[in-house]
């Protein structure tokens, strides 16, 4: 078995869509990025790639590549999952935390878990998501952005 960690952060801006865990969440601001800027899914992908010692998402989906402009991060997660399978790895579980002051995310967590689990081909019971704040400290506390951390456990088949 192997463990990997992932982290991502994106800026918030008015007029952008907010997508977390593949779920569009109603909010006056969204995250800025080359893809859909899904900070949670990006952290999960990095944790999976790290567990398999396969680099990070920037290696496979570089910012600036027109193929990935505005793409759903769930589609990228499907590709990461396929890469792991090709290299002989299976996903046991992932656990994650999103750090944001607003909006409140508790009501969206189950839907996020289902979307992420489907993209990874695992049961939603193997996907942990927690939402937290930074107690109004730092860039997250000033509502300038959001961050996410993830841990993945994979096994070699």
Swiss-Prot record:
Pathway: Isoprenoid biosynthesis; isopentenyl diphosphate biosynthesis via DXP pathway; isopentenyl diphosphate from 1-deoxy-D-xylulose 5-phosphate: step 4/6
Keywords: Isoprene biosynthesis, Lyase, Metal-binding
Organism per entry: Dehalococcoides mccartyi (strain ATCC BAA-2266 / KCTC 15142 / 195) (Dehalococcoides ethenogenes (strain 195))
Residues at the site labelled Transition state stabilizer: 133
Protein name: 2-C-methyl-D-erythritol 2,4-cyclodiphosphate synthase
CDD domains: MECDP_synthase
Pfam families named among the record's database cross-references: YgbB
Bridged cysteine pairs (disulfide): none
Cofactor binding mode and count: Binds 1 divalent metal cation per subunit.
Residues noted as binding 4-CDP-2-C-methyl-D-erythritol 2-phosphate in the record, renumbered to the chain: 8-10, 56-58, 132-135, 139, 142
Gene that this polypeptide is encoded by: ispF
């Amino acid at each position: 078995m192997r463990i990997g960690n992932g982290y991502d952060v994106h800026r918030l801006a008015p007029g952008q869509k907010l997508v977390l865990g593949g779920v569009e969440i109603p909010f006056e601001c969204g995250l800025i990025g080359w893809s859909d800027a899904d900070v949670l899914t990006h952290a999960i992908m990095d944790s999976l790639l790290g567990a398999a010692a396969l680099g990070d998402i920037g290696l496979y989906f570089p910012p600036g590549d027109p193929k990935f402009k505005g793409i759903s991060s769930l589609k990228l997660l499907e590709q990461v999952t396929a890469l792991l399978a090709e290299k002989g790895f299976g996903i046991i579980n992932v656990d994650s935390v999103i750090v944001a002051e607003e909006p409140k995310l508790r009501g969206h967590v189950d839907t996020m878990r289902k979307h992420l689990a489907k993209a990874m081909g695992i049961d939603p019971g193997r996907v942990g998501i927690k939402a937290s704040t930074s107690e109004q400290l730092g860039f997250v506390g000033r509502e300038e952005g959001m961050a996410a951390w993830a841990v993945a456990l994979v096994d070699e088949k």
